[in-house]
A protein has these predicted regions:
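Bacterial N-terminal signal peptides
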Residues: 8-18
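Residues that define the transmembrane beta-barrel architecture of outer-membrane proteins
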Residues: 54-56, 95-99, 150-154, 168, ...
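Transmembrane beta-strands of outer-membrane beta-barrel proteins
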Residues: 59-63, 114-118, 173-177, 222-224, ...
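Residues on the lipid-exposed face of transmembrane beta-strands in outer-membrane beta-barrel proteins
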Residues: 60-62, 101-105, 156-160, 174-176, ...
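Extracellular/periplasm-exposed beta-strand and loop segments of Gram-negative cell-envelope proteins
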Residues: 68-96, 119-151, 178-199, 228-232, ...
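Repeated loop/turn-to-beta-strand initiation elements of outer-membrane beta-barrel proteins
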Residues: 110-113, 166-168, 215-219, 250-254
Length: 291
């Protein structure tokens, strides 16, 4: 008679493959259940984003500017004029609150088009404390000079966001700034008047970016630059700003920053000999709406 113990073992051996398969299926099912991410049904409300996928941004800002202007206009390259500090010598304002407006279009995920306007208009009347030679005119000590110096910049900028994540973005930009300059100096008792006006397009290359520290706090920076090195003219233009923003909701934010705008031109051209060194810089307060 067969061993009774062997008869007891045989059924267990027969069941072993089935038990092993069942255990493997259970383990696989548990792993599948563990790895599957939880998803919301289509009808469930989605959480609101911190930043909307906007197509239009309107920014209004106030710049507390501290202008610094130095210039010299020569009668000829061999007869230099007098170097003038426009704030000290002519009495132009050395601080001014400047409102500015920017409109940014975002036609796609990586493209931006910005329209901007920047203007600073100043005028003053002062009795001169030194003789000044400006172009081919001489202004004498004690004479009252009424002066005007206005600068308006209209900007059109295209940007491409080559890095774009949920937390940060970096864009390369190319812009055209239309500079409109008006200067005027008048001595009324001698009927002496010297005025210059000019409009010029200025191409600028730039880079800008944003980084989100949290759902509400971000830092952003922007810089545009142009340099010219020709036979008779050397110059550069810099427009840069740095800011920190606080987002009240996905559609509205407030920011505090600093902006500097610099023009530095040195000319040895026979018709326009001289130099201009203009800096407009100061703290910036702005509000931006997204639509």
């Amino acid at each position: 008679m067969p061993n009774s113990r062997l008869l007891l073992v045989i059924p267990f051996l027969a069941l072993a493959p089935a038990l092993a398969g069942a255990a493997e299926a259970t383990t696989t099912a548990q792993a599948t259940t563990t790895q599957a991410p939880a998803t919301l049904p289509d009808w469930a409300p989605k959480p609101k984003p911190n930043v909307v996928e906007d197509r239009l941004r309107l920014e209004i800002n106030l710049l507390w500017a501290s202008p610094s202007t130095k210039l010299r206009v020569d009668e000829s390259p061999t007869q230099p004029g007098t170097e003038i500090n426009a704030e000290d010598d002519l009495g132009l304002d050395d601080s001014q609150l400047l409102p500015q407006v920017e409109l940014t279009l975002l036609p796609g995920e990586r493209h931006l088009i910005r329209l901007s306007r920047f203007a600073i208009d100043r005028s003053a009347a002062k009795h001169l404390e030194k003789n000044i030679s400006f172009d081919d005119q001489d202004y004498l000590v004690g004479e009252r000079v009424d002066s005007i110096l206005n600068l308006t910049m209209f900007g059109l900028t295209y940007g491409y966001r080559f890095i774009r994540t949920q937390q940060a973005e970096i864009s390369a930009s190319f812009g055209i700034q239309i500079a409109d300059v008006e200067t005027n100096a008048v001595v009324r008792n001698r009927v002496v008047r010297e005025s210059e006006n000019g409009v010029a397009p200025l191409p600028l290359l730039g880079i800008e970016g944003r980084y989100d520290f949290s759902p509400r706090w971000s830092a952003e920076a922007r810089v545009q630059y142009l340099t010219v090195n020709e036979t008779d003219v050397d110059g550069s233009i810099l427009d840069a700003r740095l800011g920190v923003t606080w987002r009240m909701n996905p559609y509205l934010l407030f920011g505090l920053g600093y902006r500097t705008f610099q023009i530095d031109i040195d000319s040895a051209d026979e018709d326009t000999s001289g130099f201009v060194d203009l800096t407009v810089a100061g703290p910036l307060l702005f509000v931006r709406a997204s639509m």
